[in-house]
Amino acid sequence: MPSLPLLLLLWAASSYSFPVFHNGDRQNVETVWKYLENYYNLGKNMQAKNVNGKEMMAEKLRQMQQLFGLKVTGNSDPETLRAMKKPRCGVPDVAPYAITHNNPRWTKTHLTYSILNYTPYLPKAVVEDAIARAFRVWSDVTPLTFQRVFEEEGDIVLSFHRGDHGDNNPFDGPNYKLAHTFQPGPGLGGDVHYDLDETWTNSSENFNLFYVTAHELGHSLGLTHSSDIGALMFPSYTWYTEDFVLNQDDINRIQDLYGPSPNPIQPTGATTPHPCNGDLTFDAITTFRGEVFFFKGRFYIRVNRFMPEPELNLIGILWPNLPVKLDAAYEASMIDQVRYFKGSKVWAVQEQSVLRGFPRDIHSFFGFPSNVTHIDAAVCEEETGKTYFFVDHMYWRYDENTQSMDPGYPRLTAEDFPGIDDKVDDVFQKGENFYFFHQSVQHRFNLQIRRVDDSRDSSTWFNC
């Protein structure tokens, strides 16, 4: 009979190998199995109830969790299931698009393309412009050039299809598998197929045709999916923003295949923030129902006491109608709102919805003078309902109860907040303290004794 330590070891190994389905929802088995079949090359002839099938499923789950930046457990936990249900590209995350050093590529640098048909949701001219801009995303950072042809079939053919369309990769109707592409080569090689049933747009609503096309063209040129959540080539659809900039991860990978742009000034891309980067600064910080949200570019970093690690995600995932590169934010907990600032505009948000009538102008909404063009930082003191707006080295105070500015402001920040001598970049309240941020340093200002009692690196919020 095996010893107790051996039995425990066997139990641990089996619990690690076999996926667990939470809440007794056996429907999840089919969801996970089908997802791993489609995107992770899980054998179609395997059965989930078979021991080998369970082991293989757990291994494929770990691959998926690794790529998506999830906790790697081999189990179908709720976070993994949520990721699986998001709209995404139909190209597999593994073979034939395996991440290897032998990715297929075009052997020529001048490629042609043709548009076979159109979506009914957009005018033809808008479709053509979106596709042309998507090609420019890649020609701007490589030696590649692209030309549309009309009388012949291009190297890359773009077309819209519904359901089973004869390429062994059927579409599934609205809101899930958006498009798929074939790797470089003759025939279907490089071709882009869109799901005709999707609502294609040229805005942040539904699915942006330019953004999806730019992603699919990455595959047309030989790129695989990226594990960088900020990359264009991340597998799931990430909401489009008007100031789109190609991520540096995408630039590095496409230049590995085709070389750099011939332009004398090499383009640089956006980068995804890493919470434990000691030099990391933030655009805005706010609390919300006990959590803290740190905003940077298109991203937020979310911290609460129930999460062992900070959550990095895209602003558009939670708030698709908010701008990116915010200036400031604060929570008005007495009315269950968070207010976000960019330039001279303010957005009032409850839950995930921007309230009707917003954005509003800060001059008419709060009463700022016309020479205030933006807000650097803001915080609402919980006990008093007074909101402090910091601009350069001055601050204004606003009464949330009377909805008016207090008289006698602006005042110098350093006079009323001793120790806060630099411009305030961000601020929020936690307990009896205001946390002031300047560049990558935070100062804890004790509201009871009215002075700074601690200063440290900003990344300490992320358990670094």
From Swiss-Prot:
Cofactor binding note from Swiss-Prot or TrEMBL: Binds 4 Ca(2+) ions per subunit.
Residue numbers annotated as active site: 216
Residues that, per the record, bind Zn(2+) 1: 165, 167, 180, 193
Annotated binding of Ca(2+) 2, by residue: 155, 187, 189, 191
A GO term from the CC aspect: extracellular matrix
Subcellular location field: Secreted, Extracellular space, Extracellular matrix
SUPFAM superfamilies to which the protein is assigned, alphabetical: Hemopexin-like domain, Metalloproteases ('zincins'), catalytic domain, PGBD-like
Protein name, entry field: Interstitial collagenase A
Species of the source: Mus musculus (Mouse)
